[in-house]
A protein has these predicted regions:
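Polybasic low-complexity intrinsically disordered regions
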Residues: 1-45, 55
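Short, solvent-exposed helix-loop connector elements
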Residues: 27, 149, 156-164, 179-196, ...
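An anionic, glycine-rich sequence signature occurring as long contiguous blocks
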Residues: 44, 49-169
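Short runs of predominantly hydrophobic/aromatic residues within well-ordered alpha helices
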Residues: 157, 170, 196-200, 204
């Protein structure tokens, strides 16, 4: 769906964000990257990465019998991929910086963030180079959130911080769609009816958001 929407060009976009369920789906991430798009996904703490790209090699034949090895494997002595939470714990204190993530309903949301270039794991082998973005609350540094992003190495840190704050407005938009436009008030038995209801509701919400932006903000109920 993402690739088809992008190819159609009807709704220009560059970034795809999601929660840790999507962030822990390598096939989805690779398909997004193959479509020349960038992803920024939350990931579980047990997802593993290499801080540096490990050595790989095709094993040498061990005897005269049998077919030679053809598949690349980790070279002997190659480093082991580590969990993202272990990677975050190992960061020096100077790697963390205070940043304003977004303007929330209760004021600015400020957190400590750190940015690390790492190598993703794909079928036990090194995959793409990615950003690991770590975030922790100022008053609860043990509560870690981690994100993976395939943006280029020269991506400004400000862009990665901006991406950290995108989920709140998306969640707020879904909440408003439910409360004000009946996004979740459907009584259908099949996919087509649900799809039509959802599409028309989101279209109406898009119209209202454009109108609100044009008029400088509409009063809320």
């Amino acid at each position: 769906m993402i690739a088809a929407l992008h190819a159609r060009g009807a709704l220009p976009f560059r970034w795809v964000t999601g929660d840790e369920h999507f962030g822990n789906t390598p096939m989805l991430l690779d398909q997004i990257a193959a479509a020349k798009l960038s992803y920024f996904m939350e990931i579980p703490h047990n997802v593993r990465f290499w801080p540096e790209r490990p050595l790989t090699a095709v094993p040498a034949a061990t005897g005269k019998k049998g077919a030679p090895f053809t598949r690349v494997r980790l070279a002997p002595g190659a480093s082991v991929a580590i969990r993202v939470d272990a990677l975050a714990v190992a960061l020096p204190r100077g790697a963390w910086q205070v940043a304003q993530i977004q303007d929330g309903s209760k004021g600015p949301l400020v957190a400590e963030v750190a940015f690390v270039r790492a190598v993703a794991v794909r079928d036990g082998l090194p995959g793409p180079d990615v950003w690991i973005v770590c975030r922790r609350a100022l008053d609860a540094p043990q509560e870690l959130k981690a994100y993976v992003c395939n943006a280029t190495a020269d991506t400004p840190r400000e862009t990665l911080v901006w991406l950290l704050g995108l989920r709140w407005p998306i969640e707020q938009a879904i909440k408003e769609g439910k409360e004000e436009l009946g996004l979740d008030q459907y009584e259908v038995r099949g996919w087509r009816g649900w799809h039509h209801h959802t599409a028309m509701t989101l279209l109406a919400q898009h119209f209202l958001m454009r109108l609100s932006s044009r008029l400088g903000g509409l009063p809320r109920r």
